[in-house]
């Protein structure tokens, strides 16, 4: 066994399909060029997590010190560790160092990227890096603790990278984007929320609507398929219209907020072809599709209403091992 290993995974934006993907609709998701890195070092006592964003947390190894209270921040990592142990990896004391270029709790997949990078680095430390299929399965155990009923789309894109068409229970399909001359603007509302709370709220509204909600879900699935075709054909104008329609559907099920709508309309007023929330909603981030020559105006438009904003490129590479 090596003394240490390091791995990274990309963040993501959901172009269309968040929430609806939980119940079988299509989602289009893209990895972005911001990554989260995890370094695992053996030694010490128990498990220690060190992160500039999440702080420092420690806990006994699974099966030791069962009476000790474990920080909720560490619980997903422990779930991943248990899954690794079930696959034959030895459980040893170690430190987890997290370095992230992905804002946490912002809908950009930081949690999934962390679970993926941790699972890959821990398995690599043992000299046997997980396959992509096993990496997905192990990381999902952590996401279940973090989010309750994750669709799996965040973990899939963190493992694979690129742009994917994702439907729960089916193999993801790689999309070859034909878009040129456009870029995504990402603006963070600065409002943190628990994904699990928003997912449960949206599902409760859908259930309360009964049969009417089936039409909303059908519409979401249809526009996701239209988005796929627009991306492949390079039809940015149509993709923007689809993003706007997707925002309306998400709002109808209670996923939006005043902070989100403010950023959406500021982007649209600044020339965005389309703008919508990405991720769970209730806060987190908004994405806008801009022509390259107009994105600076978009950035200026959201300065006062966001905690941070940046342009995002598509990351073709998913999870990877890294040298020290």
Curated annotation (Swiss-Prot):
This is Mevalonate kinase. It comes from Aeropyrum pernix (strain ATCC 700893 / DSM 11879 / JCM 9820 / NBRC 100138 / K1). InterPro entries: GHMP_kinase_C_dom (IPR013750), GHMP_kinase_C_sf (IPR036554), GHMP_kinase_N_dom (IPR006204), Mev_gal_kin (IPR006205), Mevalonate_kinase_arc (IPR022937), Ribosomal_Su5_D2-typ_SF (IPR020568), Ribsml_uS5_D2-typ_fold_subgr (IPR014721). Catalyzes the phosphorylation of (R)-mevalonate (MVA) to (R)-mevalonate 5-phosphate (MVAP). Functions in the mevalonate (MVA) pathway leading to isopentenyl diphosphate (IPP), a key precursor for the biosynthesis of isoprenoid compounds such as archaeal membrane lipids. Disulfide bonds: none annotated. One of its GO terms (cellular component) is cytosol. Belongs to the GHMP kinase family. Mevalonate kinase subfamily. Keywords: ATP-binding, Cytoplasm, Isoprene biosynthesis, Kinase, Lipid biosynthesis, Lipid metabolism, Magnesium, Nucleotide-binding, Transferase. SUPFAM superfamilies: GHMP Kinase, C-terminal domain (SSF55060), Ribosomal protein S5 domain 2-like (SSF54211). Homodimer. The gene is mvk. Its cofactor is Mg(2+). GO terms for molecular function: ATP binding; magnesium ion binding; mevalonate kinase activity. ATP binds at residues 103-113. One of its GO terms (biological process) is isopentenyl diphosphate biosynthetic process, mevalonate pathway.
């Amino acid at each position: 066994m090596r003394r240490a290993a390091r791995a990274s995974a990309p963040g993501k934006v959901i172009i269309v399909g968040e929430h609806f993907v939980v119940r079988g609709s299509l989602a289009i998701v893209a990895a972005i060029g911001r990554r989260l890195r995890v370094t695992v070092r053996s030694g010490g006592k128990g498990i220690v997590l060190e992160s500039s964003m999440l702080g420092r947390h420690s806990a006994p190894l699974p099966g030791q010190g069962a009476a000790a209270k474990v920080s909720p921040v560490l619980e997903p990592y422990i779930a991943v560790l248990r899954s690794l142990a079930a696959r034959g990896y030895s459980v040893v004391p170690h430190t987890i160092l997290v370095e992230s270029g992905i804002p946490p709790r912002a809908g950009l997949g930081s949690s999934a990227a962390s679970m993926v990078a941790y699972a890959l680095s821990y398995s690599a430390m043992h000299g046997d890096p997980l396959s992509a299929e096993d990496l997905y399965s192990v990381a999902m155990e952590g996401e279940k603790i973090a989010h309750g009923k994750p669709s799996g789309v965040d973990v899939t894109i963190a493992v694979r990278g690129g742009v994917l068409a994702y439907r729960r229970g089916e193999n993801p399909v790689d999309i070859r984007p034909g878009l040129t001359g456009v870029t995504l603007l990402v603006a963070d509302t600065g409002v943190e929320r628990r994904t699990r709370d928003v997912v449960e709220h949206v599902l409760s509204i859908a259930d309360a609507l009964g049969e009417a909600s089936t039409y909303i879900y059908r519409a979401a699935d249809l526009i996701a398929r239209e988005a796929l075709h627009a991306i492949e054909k390079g039809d940015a104008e149509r993709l923007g219209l689809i993003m706007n329609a997707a925002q309306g559907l998400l709002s109808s099920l209670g996923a939006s907020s005043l902070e989100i709508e403010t950023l959406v309309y500021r982007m649209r007023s600044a020339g965005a072809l389309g703008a919508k929330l990405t991720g769970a909603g209730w806060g987190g981030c908004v994405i806008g599709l801009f022509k390259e020559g107009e994105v600076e105006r978009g950035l200026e438009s959201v300065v006062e209403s966001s905690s941070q904003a940046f342009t995002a490129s598509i990351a073709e590479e998913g999870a990877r091992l890294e040298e020290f």
